[in-house]
Amino acid sequence: MVVAPSQVEQQNWTPAASAQLYGLDQWGDPYFSVNARGHVLVQPRGDRGGSLDLVELVEGLQSRDLQLPLLIRFEDILEDRLERLHGAFERAIAQYGYGGHYQGVFPVKCNQQRHVVEQLVESGRRWHFGLEAGSKAELLIALSLLDDPKALLICNGYKDQRYIETAILARQLGRQPVVVIEQADEVPRIIEASRNLGAAPLIGVRAKLSTRSTGRWGSSVGEKAKFGLSIPDLLATVEALRDADLLGDLRLLHFHVGSQICDIAVLKDALQEAGQLYVQLASLGAPMGFLDVGGGLGVDYDGSRSATAASTNYSLQNYANDVVATIRECCEPQGIVVPTLVSESGRAIASHFSVLVFNVLGQSGVNQPSIPEAVEGEALIVRNLRETLSGIGPDNLQEAWNDALKFKDDALAAFRLGYLSLTERGKAEQLYWACCSAIADLLPGEEELPDELKGLKAAFASTYYANLSVFRSAPDTWAIDQLFPVMPIHRLEEQPRELGSFADLTCDSDGKLARFIASGSAKPLLELHELKDGEPYWIGLFLGGAYQEVMGNLHNLFGSTNAVSIRLSPGGPYRVEHVVRGQTNSDVLEAMEHNPEALLERLRQASEEAIGSGDLSISAARRLMQHLEGSLRQTTYLEE
């Protein structure tokens, strides 16, 4: 067992100490905190009142036969995110005397689940909040759900003729589609479709900005960006639309500088460049009217408020202020009417609203190395290791590590030359690992360690076996090393005395959670509690509401988890609005083109053969088939 160093001297542990330890006061504000019972508390409406004890909520859901792992969606948080986003822009518009307004859209790709998109459309109706589609399937979702004629339907992504025609025909349904030209070859397709259908959509253009971005999504901008028109392509598009008598339909300029803008300076540079492009397009005769600043409004996953990959060095209000002020400064001196401002802030809207709760199935760790008894006539190398072990203290950790490593290597060399017996070599290795364990227990925080000592803690840390699939529920942790806040949702009044990481259910060494938030960085181990016999240990993964549900896969055939939508209720603590049962074994088999009925039939035939050979009785065969049929109906995850 490795004791968390920052806690060794802590005597009177409190829930507030846990909140500080896990950074809850930073990344969780204003939706998550800790109550006096040591449970995570959810405030779905932020500082506007109302709260739920997350542990009591999970217990209530389990009593409804909804077992872990469980994805809990808080509808009030989703609505609150919309209110905060629009409120920030409304304050900025008032502060800077901006002559236009803000009208956002939600990128459907962030979370295509029907209940999520439906709620966003309904909650955003008062602001004419719209949707963004990046494929034909997403366009069909948006067309069916977005029934507000004043809401924007931004059509991005690669487009064939059917995609473009579908968008144009949507105007006949009272929708307001904007087909954004992202590739030069889309221009003739739009012209042809408009002629064939006798109607044109509102047209937008996406510009490749020269502004350099940072972080893992930095490739979204620049000359090598996947989408967007270069300046020559932009000018050619204007002339092609003019020749086709469609320039009057060019209404929107779009740019995008990454899914998570960590540094506000990147946004400022992009806004200045895009603002001037907007002015020039208007000067060339396009009526314009909308400026879509794309996605990128970031989420402070680690609470450090820094320009690192898991954080942002700006607030929501800071973001809105810079967008409004910069575009006003670009347009007004040139006599250009300021545009309606559009953003595709999917990550900032959806990340906070869902919490994945999973249970721990077991725990394993490296046993404390035993120390062999000293005997007369021990080899010098063994005596040296024994002396090193007895002299380890907080002030000589590096020296002790160097000595232990040297003596271990000496023991191996002596054994190879025949100067050390197998028994003595075994003693040397036991003493070496005892030295490592003693050093690991006294090490300070990871950020203070020299490189050669950083692996010691992990070598003695515990592995907690989690009832989930990382590939299904948090794929970005594996794919791009994304950091999400992970912490126990109860026992927070207790001092966590172990350091550990999580292994998931898949038969894959990458199936793990082994990077955890630290202030402005990441750490390989998380402070956790020792498991208690007969008591559950529940862990929450937070801020995963964007992308994780829709990007998860069926690795090892672990399917979707149970999911519920929760809303605060005036007549009680909460109301379960929607329940979506997780995939069963039968569901995932069918997804892989296996026929469950055919599978059962083959097993039935095998049981008949066993009956015929006398290996199985009829009653045993019946019980076997009932068990197999029941297994097909069960969840893919382990039952408690």
Curated annotation (Swiss-Prot):
Substrate binds at L291, D292, V293, G294, G295, G296, L297, G298, V299, D300, Y301. Signal peptide: none annotated. Transmembrane segments: none annotated. Its cofactor is Mg(2+); pyridoxal 5'-phosphate. Pathway: Amine and polyamine biosynthesis; agmatine biosynthesis; agmatine from L-arginine: step 1/1. It is an enzyme of class 4 (lyase). The modification N6-(pyridoxal phosphate)lysine is found at K109. Keywords: Decarboxylase, Lyase, Magnesium, Metal-binding, Polyamine biosynthesis, Pyridoxal phosphate, Spermidine biosynthesis. One of its GO terms (molecular function) is arginine decarboxylase activity. It catalyses: L-arginine + H(+) = agmatine + CO2. The keyword Metal-binding applies. Coiled coil: none annotated. Its EC number is 4.1.1.19. Belongs to the Orn/Lys/Arg decarboxylase class-II family. SpeA subfamily. Catalyzes the biosynthesis of agmatine from arginine. NCBIfam families: PRK05354.1, speA. This is Biosynthetic arginine decarboxylase. It comes from Synechococcus sp. (strain RCC307). The gene is speA.
